């Protein structure tokens, strides 16, 4: 993590000939927003004097109480490597303040900060490593995105089958220019599908990095004449894109508290409790980690996405997997989230659920180490295995029943988010789709 001072940033802006600075933040959906200023206005911004209309942002303020201010996080200063070398463009990620100087409680970044602070109070640091998947599609003659690709590549393929290889390479190099430690990148199962994994870090920095990652991917793809999409399931009968979260807790001296060499699985009681908390709250959490109608098209058996609420030390079909540890570092992989999620809210509910498991000493059921997709309904029922919500409205109903998870977000954000998502689902179910026309028009 950078440790910049105000003077550091002013000096870098002058030395690097930075002409514009983008003050970035997210709405409740995780859409990146920004206010652009020239370098002459930077000192004003660093004094938290940059005001904007909060009523224009989804999930923020009412018209009658809409004056809000951006408070830059100095450690997030980065210069965009793809912009011109003269009059460069930099960015600062920002927290949101109300007019009275207090923090805006529904700012997604602040929501995550609150849960991180709760963990710190009991001696834990929350580290997360995401696995972000996306598609690279062609654009049409007007430059608009399509779901078409010439390539036929699959898992771990390379050029000439992998036509997006050059774009993916430039994405990785750009990320490294911006300070990312990229661990690996490769082609995924579906044609035109890719994955880039960057090193785990503390949760707030990881959420910031996910937002930066999505911006870089879309920007570099466009330079290659491609459209990058993080839509979870853009094509029928193909694998969808997820964002597996590899999570661990560390104590005040940096030790992984999920480790226990005396346990048969190498896992501490805190690790089991954390899993128990995730499994207890996962139905409600899914409303946040899988936030759009299309998210639930990914939850189909046989397409590398979880359907069942279970865990395993090695099996990849359940919701939660414990990957082979690297040097005794146990991590818990939650396989359901997708990249449509607001990363700040997604990580907030993941950590909060795990902490509830630890505080309440919630032991998970026994692990299931066989292929869940090959188990009959009777076998699943006998094992006590339940399913994730199968659509956005079902997830919303589960969310509304879970007071603990709702409390993580706060009443104001809960109200605005659920209202917006119910409207989204109602719009969806009233649509007449191409599938319906093909199925019924000619015979009814």
What kind of region is each of these model predictions?
Residues 81-88, 125-127, 185-190, 238, ...:
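Short glycine/proline-enriched loop/turn "hinge" motifs that connect secondary-structure elements
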């Amino acid at each position: 993590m950078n440790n910049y001072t105000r003077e550091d940033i002013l000096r870098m802006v002058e030395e690097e000939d930075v002409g514009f600075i983008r003050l970035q933040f997210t709405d409740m959906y995780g859409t990146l927003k920004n206010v652009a200023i020239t370098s002459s206005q930077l000192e004003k911004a660093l004094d938290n004097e940059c005001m904007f209309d909060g009523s224009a942002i989804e999930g923020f303020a009412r018209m009658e109480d809409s004056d809000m201010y951006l408070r830059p996080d100095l450690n997030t200063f980065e210069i965009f490597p793809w912009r011109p070398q003269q009059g460069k463009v930099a960015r600062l990620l920002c927290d949101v303040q109300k007019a009275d100087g207090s923090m805006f409680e529904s700012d997604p970044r602040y929501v995550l900060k609150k849960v991180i602070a709760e963990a710190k109070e009991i001696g834990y640091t929350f580290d997360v490593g995401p696995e972000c998947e996306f598609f690279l599609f062609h654009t049409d003659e007007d430059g608009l995105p399509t779901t078409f690709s010439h390539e036929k590549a699959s898992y771990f393929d390379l050029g000439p089958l992998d036509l997006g290889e050059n774009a993916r390479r430039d994405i990785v190099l750009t990320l490294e220019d911006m300070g990312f430690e990229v661990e690996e990148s490769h082609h995924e199962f579906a044609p035109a599908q890719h994955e880039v994994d960057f090193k785990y870090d503390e949760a707030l920095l990881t959420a910031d990095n996910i937002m930066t990652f999505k911006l870089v991917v879309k920007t570099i793809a466009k330079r290659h004449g491609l459209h990058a999409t993080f839509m979870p399931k853009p094509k029928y009968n193909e694998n969808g894109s997820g964002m597996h979260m590899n999570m661990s807790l560390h104590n005040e001296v940096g030790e992984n508290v999920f480790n226990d060499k005396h346990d048969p699985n190498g896992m501490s009681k805190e690790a089991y409790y954390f899993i128990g908390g995730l499994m207890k709250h996962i139905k409600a959490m899914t409303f946040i980690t899988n936030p759009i109608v299309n998210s639930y098209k990914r939850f189909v058996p046989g397409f590398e996405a979880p359907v069942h609420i279970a865990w395993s030390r090695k099996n990849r079909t359940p919701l939660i997997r414990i990957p082979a540890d690297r040097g005794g570092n146990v991590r818990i992989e939650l396989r359901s989230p997708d990249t449509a999620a607001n990363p700040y809210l997604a990580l907030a509910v993941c950590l909060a659920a795990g902490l509830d498991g630890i505080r309440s000493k919630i032991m998970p059921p026994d692990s299931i180490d066989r292929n869940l997709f090959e188990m009959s309904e009777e076998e699943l029922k006998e094992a006590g295995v339940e399913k994730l919500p199968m659509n956005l409205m079902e997830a919303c109903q589960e969310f509304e029943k879970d007071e603990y998870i709702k409390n993580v977000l706060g009443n104001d954000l809960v109200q605005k988010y659920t209202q917006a998502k119910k409207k989204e689902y109602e719009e969806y179910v009233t649509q007449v789709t191409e599938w319906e026309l093909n199925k019924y028009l000619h015979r009814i």
